[in-house]
UniProtKB/Swiss-Prot annotation:
3'-phosphoadenylyl sulfate binds at residues 44-49, 121, 129, 184, 218-223, 247-249. PANTHER family: SULFOTRANSFERASE SULT (PTHR11783). Its EC number is 2.8.2.2, 2.8.2.14. It comes from Mus musculus (Mouse). Gene3D superfamilies: P-loop containing nucleotide triphosphate hydrolases (3.40.50.300). Sulfotransferase that utilizes 3'-phospho-5'-adenylyl sulfate (PAPS) as sulfonate donor to catalyze the sulfonation of the hydroxyl group of hydroxysteroids and bile acids. GO terms for cellular component: cytosol. The active site is at 99 (proton acceptor). The keyword Methyltransferase does not apply. This is Sulfotransferase 2A6. It is found in: Cytoplasm, Cytosol.
Length: 285
């Protein structure tokens, strides 16, 4: 699988949609504006769900926008060639998405007032979700077994690098008032409460009926049926068994796939790598 990567500044980037030259430009040239809103995640953490919620909050629950424009056009990917081009030419407030680790992100962000929503998911579920996602595409040649992918994940030799370093890097920003941290598990447990939290962060005041519409149209089933959100528009030659972007949308699926030995190995790495964070900070602990 490593043949599908380009290494840049110690991070393996997916060849199929990220070019090193664009990432360099993002880091050195891209100007973040104070009125921008940035959705940041490590891959397979619920990114598209968050995009859907944020878009629906902006329209007060009206689904016309999310049902007529693909999500990668509503919130372009900063590190993709097409997304970068759109964002650099767009005037006014911009909504954008990125998986980049903190050391590759736009330097201009750190002196701006732009708002960031950073979504975190249990890395065990991230690992399993990522494996099955790539297994269903033609984007990866010779995908190894889950066991080997497990080892690669713990070493950080997967797309966008180490989950642990990604989290450490971005969570260093968590005390800033323009940086909102969300957890996938909390979203699953209390989606409405999470939507309200995002509204408060963005200064948006939605009524009860509008909140219910956001909840309705951002549900797993609604997104699965929305061709603008389920990636069914992706060219067929890029996929094999259908691009399973939305496989289960559950928490705890890793328990169906990890062996006892893998569970113990993961727990040890997690404890070693996440030292320094307060106990109980992560909802899956």
């Amino acid at each position: 699988m490593m043949s599908d990567y380009s290494w840049f500044e110690g991070i393996p980037l997916p060849d199929m949609w990220v070019q090193k030259e664009i990432v360099e430009d993002v880091h050195n040239k891209f100007v973040v504006k104070d009125e921008d809103l940035i959705i940041l995640t490590y891959p397979k953490s619920g990114t598209n769900w968050l995009i859907e919620i944020v878009c629906l909050i902006q329209t007060k629950g009206d689904p016309k926008w999310i049902q007529s424009v693909p999500n990668w056009e509503r919130s372009p990917w900063l590190e993709s060639k097409s997304g970068y081009s759109v964002l650099t030419s767009k005037e006014g407030p911009r909504l954008m998405t990125s998986h980049l680790p903190i050391h590759l992100f736009s330097k201009s962000f750190f002196s701006s007032k732009a708002k960031v929503i950073y979504l975190i998911r249990n890395p065990r579920d991230v690992l399993v979700s990522g494996y099955f996602f790539w297994a269903n595409t033609n984007l990866v040649k010779n995908l190894e077994s889950l066991g080997i992918y497990f080892e690669q994940f713990l070493k950080g030799n997967v797309r966008y690098g180490s989950w642990f370093e990604h989290i450490h890097g971005w969570l260093s920003m968590r005390e800033r008032n323009n940086f909102l941290v969300l957890y996938y598990e909390d979203m699953k447990k209390d989606a409405k409460g999470t939507i309200k939290k995002i509204c408060d962060f963005l200064g948006k005041n939605l009524g009860p009926d509008e909140l219910d519409l956001v909840l309705k149209y951002s549900s797993f089933q609604a997104m699965k049926e929305n061709n603008m959100s389920n990636y069914s528009l992706i060219k067929e030659d890029q996929i094999t068994n259908g691009l399973k972007l939305m496989r289960k949308g559950t928490t705890g699926d890793w328990k169906n796939h990890f062996t006892v030995a893998q569970t113990e190995a993961f727990d040890k790495v997690f404890q070693d790598k996440m030292v320094g964070f307060p106990p109980g900070m992560f909802p899956w602990e």
